């Protein structure tokens, strides 16, 4: 469905159709709310071969999980719009308008931002050919499949050190390569931990990833050295998939993640967030759980006060 205006004001408007957004849509619909999901169709894990550790769906392809979620949404009456949201505007004191590319508008009483994030990729020939199979960005997601393997972490500074330390859960054969960038190991703690775990740091620029099919043979460095490895993990940086959250005024951390409470509330009234756009581990199953949690909070915010009990007052014991 293309960008268009919708006359209805939905109870719940969701931006993003990944695990967080679809999970929130499913649960909001189960509470009999009218729900719309607007999705750009450009997920972060576009080339990932499988999702690991998702209860009941081990090894499912991300596209298949999304398709299954969309089918379930349709069965529950959720409106699915394939479009890009350019901005979100306030309508009155309570509602929102989702302004779509092409001029359409969608109206909602509550907003869930599940837009995800994007990874900064190193400019490295051959990397795209092995991404999702033997090149990764998430040790939590793909560390188990890397157990006992030779791994090169591409990155520098705290990010690279943290990723390398995380990967020691599964292997002790790790090298950090900064790909020509300064190491930025300014804190003695970084050097001490890397030295104790025998993790060397190379600063030479990588010329190319040598591969066959989806298997990596080595990384060819600018000085002619060939760095043997089985897998590559890279951590150059991340950024929000778009600037909707910033434009709306949501409070964010230093890396651009939207700060939420345990129920998914953002700093903006009636606006919620879930999934990778929020701080913490970036796992599909966590995103889905956050979406469900946010849906419950959204439902409670939509229930009239006449259908709620007053909060229970807890007695304070005296000693």
Features from the language model and the residues they span:
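Residue-level detector of alpha-helix initiation sites
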Residues: 18-20, 117-119, 158-159, 278
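Active-site glycine-rich loop that binds ribose-phosphate moieties when present
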Residues: 133-141, 150-163, 184-185
């Amino acid at each position: 469905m293309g960008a268009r205006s919708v006359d209805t004001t939905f109870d719940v408007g969701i931006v993003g159709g990944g695990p967080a957004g679809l999970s929130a849509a499913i649960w909001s619909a189960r509470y009999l709310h009218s729900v719309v999901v607007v999705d750009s169709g450009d997920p972060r894990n576009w080339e990932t071969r499988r999702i690991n550790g998702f209860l009941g769906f081990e090894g499912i392809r991300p596209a298949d999980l999304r398709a299954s979620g969309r089918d379930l949404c349709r069965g529950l009456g959720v409106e699915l719009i394939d479009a890009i949201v350019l901005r979100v505007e306030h309508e009155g004191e309570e509602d929102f308008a989702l302004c779509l590319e092409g001029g359409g508008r969608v109206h909602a009483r509550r907003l869930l931002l599940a837009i995800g994030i994007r990874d900064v990729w190193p400019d490295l020939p051959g990397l795209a050919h092995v991404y999702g199979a033997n090149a990764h960005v998430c040790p939590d997601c793909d560390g188990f499949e890397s157990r006992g393997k030779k791994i090169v972490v591409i990155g520098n500074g705290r990010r690279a050190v943290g990723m390398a330390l995380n990967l020691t859960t599964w292997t002790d054969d790790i090298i950090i390569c900064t790909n020509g960038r300064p190491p930025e190991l300014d804190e003695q703690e970084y050097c001490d931990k890397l030295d104790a775990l025998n993790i060397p740091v190379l600063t030479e620029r990588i010329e190319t990833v040598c591969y066959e099919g989806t298997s990596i043979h080595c990384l060819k460095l600018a000085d002619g050295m060939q760095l043997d490895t089985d897998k590559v993990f890279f951590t150059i940086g991340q950024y929000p998939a778009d600037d909707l959250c910033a434009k709306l005024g949501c409070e964010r951390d230093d890396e651009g993640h939207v700060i939420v409470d345990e129920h998914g509330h953002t700093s903006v009234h009636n606006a919620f967030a879930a999934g990778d756009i929020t701080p913490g581990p970036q796992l599909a199953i966590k995103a889905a759980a956050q979406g469900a949690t946010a849906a419950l909070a959204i439902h409670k915010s939509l229930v009239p006060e006449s259908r709620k009990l007053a909060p229970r007052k807890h007695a304070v014991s005296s000693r």
